[in-house]
C-alpha cells in the first residue's frame, strides 16, 4: 500500500485558513450594528384615582377569625 503524501497539506491549509479569516472579516465589516437604545424622558401622567382620597379597609371582616 502506498503512503499518503502529506507534505503539501500545510501549504494548502494555511492559505485556506487565511482566506476564511479574510472573508469573515469582510463580511463583518459590511454588517450594520445598531446602537443601543437611549432612554427617552417620560412625562408622568396624573390619572384621576377615586380611591386615593378615601380610606379603604385592608382586610374584609369575613376573613377574620371568630372572636368570642
Swiss-Prot record:
The UniProt entry's GO biological process terms, in alphabetical order, are: proton motive force-driven ATP synthesis; proton motive force-driven mitochondrial ATP synthesis
Q: Which domain of life is it from?
A: Eukaryota
- Which compartments does it reside in? Mitochondrion membrane
Q: Which Pfam families match?
A: ATP-synt_8
**Known InterPro entries for this protein?**
ATP8_mammal (IPR039017), ATP8_metazoa (IPR001421)
> What stretches pass through the bilayer?
8-21
Instruction: Mark the residues carrying the PTM N6-acetyllysine.
Output: 54, 57
Q: Which GO terms describe its molecular function?
A: proton transmembrane transporter activity
What topology does the record note for this protein and the membrane? Single-pass membrane protein
One GO term of the cellular component aspect?
proton-transporting ATP synthase complex
Q: How does it assemble?
A: Component of the ATP synthase complex composed at least of ATP5F1A/subunit alpha, ATP5F1B/subunit beta, ATP5MC1/subunit c (homooctomer), MT-ATP6/subunit a, MT-ATP8/subunit 8, ATP5ME/subunit e, ATP5MF/subunit f, ATP5MG/subunit g, ATP5MK/subunit k, ATP5MJ/subunit j, ATP5F1C/subunit gamma, ATP5F1D/subunit delta, ATP5F1E/subunit epsilon, ATP5PF/subunit F6, ATP5PB/subunit b, ATP5PD/subunit d, ATP5PO/subunit OSCP.
User: What disease is linked with this protein in Swiss-Prot or TrEMBL?
Assistant: Mitochondrial complex V deficiency, mitochondrial 2: A mitochondrial disorder with heterogeneous clinical manifestations including neuropathy, ataxia, hypertrophic cardiomyopathy. Hypertrophic cardiomyopathy can present with negligible to extreme hypertrophy, minimal to extensive fibrosis and myocyte disarray, absent to severe left ventricular outflow tract obstruction, and distinct septal contours/morphologies with extremely varying clinical course. Cardiomyopathy, infantile hypertrophic: An infantile form of hypertrophic cardiomyopathy, a heart disorder characterized by ventricular hypertrophy, which is usually asymmetric and often involves the interventricular septum. The symptoms include dyspnea, syncope, collapse, palpitations, and chest pain. They can be readily provoked by exercise. The disorder has inter- and intrafamilial variability ranging from benign to malignant forms with high risk of cardiac failure and sudden cardiac death.
Give a short account of what the protein does: Subunit 8, of the mitochondrial membrane ATP synthase complex (F(1)F(0) ATP synthase or Complex V) that produces ATP from ADP in the presence of a proton gradient across the membrane which is generated by electron transport complexes of the respiratory chain. ATP synthase complex consist of a soluble F(1) head domain - the catalytic core - and a membrane F(1) domain - the membrane proton channel. These two domains are linked by a central stalk rotating inside the F(1) region and a stationary peripheral stalk.
Q: What is this protein called?
A: ATP synthase F(0) complex subunit 8
Amino acid at each position: 500500500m502506498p503512503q499518503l503524501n502529506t507534505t503539501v497539506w500545510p501549504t494548502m491549509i494555511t492559505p485556506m485558513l487565511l482566506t476564511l479569516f479574510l472573508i469573515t472579516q469582510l463580511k463583518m465589516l459590511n454588517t450594520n450594528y445598531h446602537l443601543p437604545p437611549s432612554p427617552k424622558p417620560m412625562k408622568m401622567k396624573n390619572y384621576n384615582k377615586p380611591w386615593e382620597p378615601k380610606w379603604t379597609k385592608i382586610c374584609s371582616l369575613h376573613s377574620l377569625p371568630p372572636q368570642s
